[in-house]
Amino acid sequence: MEFLFLREKAPFACCVGEMGFALRYCGAGFCLRRAERGKAGMFRPFFVSCVESAKGWGWLYVEKVVFAKHLFVLKRYFYERCALAKKGRYAIPERKNLKEAIMIDFKVDESLCVSCGACVKDCLHQALRMDMYPVMVDEGHCIRCQHCLAVCPTGAVSIMGTAASDCTPLAGNIPEPRQLDTLFKGRRSVRHYKRENVSPALLQELLDSAAYAPTGSNAQNLLVSVVDDIAAMDAFREAVYLRLDELAETGAMPDCQRRAFFLSAGKLWKAGGWDGIFRSAPHCVIVANAKNATCVEQDPLIYLSYFELMAQARGIGTLWCGLLYWCLRDVLPDFLLRLGIPDTHQLGYAMLFGYPSINYRRTVETRSALVRHIGWN
């Protein structure tokens, strides 16, 4: 994931002090500062749905150890501490690539290591070699995939500040195939939602799970923008339809996919509140990828697939929103910056989500894909 500073003149003031940062992290915009009330040593983040409409505090206590991890990354992420942040005005300093920012810090507990060489064998770019025990010979070749940590049979390896004791063992914790199969078959596109915010804790759980989605070359350059509040979503929705109506009325609608739909969408919204794009969803998540990423188009789709499956497993409805994607890409690209997507990133896709107002009772039958079993002589 990439950190994105809030735009200059963001309409709130905080984070000038111990942290000195206002940032977006893992797709949820927030800044951390010491809580004025509450448990000693705790912090509260300020969630914002849009960098230009930050209102009110969203309360969530963060344990010291979690805060320390954020600070660990921040200290290594910027060439200079953000002394530029003053009185609520934030400039964007020169940034490092996040992969380069986190120290590799490869360590082996020799009392646990059995010198099996599994970590060396599985290292894609041969950054490790055996010298009685595994050693890191070229940090420049390490892509931070952490396979060495995952494959070690005795838990002797730690890397990037993470040890085996910090991880979840796979044995006994993988869902039964039948359960996964039911989840896949029971996944439905949801177009009817309750007018209710998804709880911040649950939303963060979904984002944390989706962060494990693979990216090409382990680039991890995705940028995730989340509209996590109904009021912000209503404002976003209204702005989209009013702009579409304006373009239709002035004859300025560009040639684009689903142009006929966009020509009428704004008028139908103004006439009777017909929400053909957003389906009255309370939230949306929009994923972009760095334009220089290895798999610029594929990575966002994989991320959203992870997000969707975890969401539906937790009772949250989702909808792949091609209409919003086409609208932002082809008709309203100027909205991207307001959604926290800079020119360095390419729009990947959009997904609506929220508590469903309709319940599906069973799986359905679907047509199988055309499969060809290939022999090669």
Task: For the regions a language model picked out, list residue spans one by one.
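Low-complexity, intrinsically disordered or signal/transmembrane-proximal segments
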Residues: 25, 61, 70, 77-79, ...
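Targeting/processing segments of secretory and organellar proteins
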Residues: 39-40, 82
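Tryptophan (W) side chains
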Residues: 57-59
